[in-house]
Amino acid sequence: MKSKWLILFIVFGLILTACGGGSDDAAEEEVVAEEPAEELDSPATTAAAAEPVADPPSICLVLDIGGLGDLSFNDLAYSGYQKAIEDFGMVGTFLEPDGGGENRGELLELCAEAGNDLIVGNGFLFDGAMNEVAPSYPDINFAITDGVAEPGNVRGMLFKHAEGSFLAGVAAALKTTTNNVGFIGGVDFPLIHEFEQGYLAGVAAINPDITVQIGYASVPPDFSGFNDPVKGKEIALAQYEAGADIIYHAAGGTGTGMFEAAKEVSEATGTKVWGCLLYTSDAADDYIR
């Protein structure tokens, strides 16, 4: 039993590292290739590793808006989830929400009723659902990324987004040939402002005369800006048209539209433009850095 809880403790660290805030040392994260998602009414269970632990701990990861394939925070959390299963022989289940995430609480309850030892809600939008569901399951550990919740059995995982974004800004300032770069945020609210401000500071640290274009896909209470590739492409094309040659995003699945725009502009003009993502991916080949 002690080994079971030790593994759970280590898994918290894996998830923290995967989401970019586990330590002060820079680390490269690799987004896992897209795989088919499970149906909500019959979640799949991943087999334990080759050397299973007696009474292996179980983890349930509930993704948020955009789900797998967003090339952003959902894919990154999923990579940490897979590593926990592979390295520690855990039994794992992952679920994806409805389009707007309205069923977050239902999915958390589904994980709890299945008896999972650790349940992770991926994103600050789980705070309300955590407050409602977690008190009914005091013996189960819950965690929420980028947020906090009141119940004593819920742990919030908060990160220094501005620091990583500062480095992205430095890189953009060093790479640009037009002295014009862009930023796309998913939703115009404080959490994403951390990414924006870090990026702006990084650019200014290299060259304060560089123009930085700012665009957001939506404003609260509309959180669709985290999964609107069409809007992301529209904003990116406008920024490229206005002279940007590098764009950095913190917009979840909306950012995939930015990658499409980068590819289109590069192929149409013969001039290389870049779409930049905080988390590494090869999904758009040379158009992501």
Residue ranges and their predicted role:
Residues 20-28:
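Bacterial lipoprotein signal-peptidase II cleavage site
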Residues 59-85, 93-104, 124, 188-193:
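Extracytoplasmic "Venus flytrap"
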Residues 81, 166-214:
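An alpha-beta-alpha
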Residues 157-179, 232, 289:
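Hydrophobic alpha-helical segments within soluble ligand-binding/sensing domains
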Residues 279-288:
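Single conserved hydrophobic/aromatic residue that forms the stacking wall/gate
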Residues 135-159, 281:
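Flexible loop/hinge segments that line or gate small-molecule binding clefts
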Residues 198-243:
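Extracellular/periplasmic Venus flytrap/periplasmic-binding protein
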